[in-house]
Each structure stands twice: as C-alpha cells, then as structure tokens.
Amino acid sequence: ELFGVEVECDTSSYEYYISSSSQLKNDKTRQWLLNSFTVSNMIEAGRNMKDRILFEEIPEGTEYLQTVIDAMQRKKELKIDYKPFNGHQSIFHLQPYAMKVYHQRWYVVGYLKEQEGIRNIALDRILEMELTDDSFILPNDFDAEEYYAHTVGIFVNDKLKPQKVVVRVFGVHVEYMRSLPLHFSQQEIKTEHKEYSDFEYQLCLTPELTSQLLAMGEKIEVMEPIGLREEIRKRLFAAINRYK
C-alpha cells in the first residue's frame, strides 16, 4: 500500500507476484521509493557492516519535504524565507508544481508570485517554510517531465530552444557514456573503432551543460554547435591561464 503496488497470489502454485509490474516499471517515483526501501532493509539486515557501506552526505532541507508534498496535494501556496548562495535573503510565495532531485539536492519547481514566473527552489537554501491557506490552480498544460525534457540539470530558461549538440568521446570513456548517458536524448551516431564515438543530443545550452562538459576535460571534444564549442575552448584556456 505504501508504494501503490498490488501483490497477488497464484493459488495453483501458491506463489506471490506483482500484478501491476508494468505500471511499476513506468512509474519512476515508485521505482525510486521501492529501491530506497529495499536498500534500507538490506543495510538494516547487515548492521554490523554499516561502517563499510558509505553514502554521500545529503544537504539540509529534507525536513521540508512533507510540507511541500502536502502543499502540492492540497494545491496550497507556500510562504518561504529563502537565501540563495549568491543573493540576498528574501520572503516570497510559491505555488508548488513538482519536485526534482539533482546531485543529492531536492528542488521544488513552481510559480513564484513575486517574480511572476516558474522558478526552481533548492530546499537546502530555505530558512523557513509555511503552508498557507491560499489555494492555486495547477495549469493543465504543465508537465514536469516535459519542463525538464531538453535541459541537463535543474536550470530552465523558457527563452532557450533545444539545439543539436554533438560530443566526441574518446577511449574508455565511451563505455562510461554508454552506461550513464549525459541525457536521455543521447544517440550514438558514429563509432571509430576503439578510438572515439560521437554522441548526439537535443539540448538547451544552459550553464549546467557547459559545466558538465568542462568536467569531462580531455575525455571529450564538443563538435557542434560552433558557439558551444567556442565557449568550451575559451573556458579551457582560461583554466590553463590560472596555472601560469
């Protein structure tokens, strides 16, 4: 019941099975919850090995998860006291549409009334949160997966249009890219023996995309578009100059 999974029994063999397995397969939230629950149970069963099973530290903000979920379910606005890393503390009202996990951080995406637009809010930068009595209507045309469909990471700019991005990946890193794609739109369009492979994407050119490509360093080469290739080249030269 916790995961919305129906378990039934085959009376002929007395075997239990998940009757809604196809539904579970297509529901990423339930998959994530069930996997987390399974891992938690395995670790609890092997408590004597807890010092040998290491996890990344999750930032603060998880204490607000239940409040955000309640607000989403009841369609109530949130009053938030917020302080971003590079800005001033402010109080605003948010209509929560969806939530997303990225790089071990929780984000809530919704309509920020004071700025009259959809924004992403990091839960670990929230100082205080209050569930208000003010209701809102979730737009019929808002689809969380579609909202993030052409972006790497959390940053979305409505003014940007997706472009064809081609990245050449070298050596053994090709296998890493195949097993852990940069984005779900990834397609391998060319392979040159074991030397390199070209991967194509449909992406908006966001700062997070640039950062991830830079992080791959000499393992990759941006082929298209020319503007992104030039941006990566300039940033790499700037990094080299730091060491002169």
Where are these regions (language model features)?
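DNA-recognition element of transcription regulators
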Residues: 1
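Bulky hydrophobic/aromatic content
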Residues: 4-83
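Structural motif
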Residues: 10-12, 102, 193
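Short acidic, glycine-rich loop/turn motifs
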Residues: 82-86, 112-115, 169-171
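Short aromatic-glycine-enriched beta-strand elements
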Residues: 105-109
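Flexible linker/loop signature enriched in Pro/Ser/Thr and Pro/Gly
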Residues: 116-147
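Polybasic (Lys/Arg-rich)
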Residues: 149-244
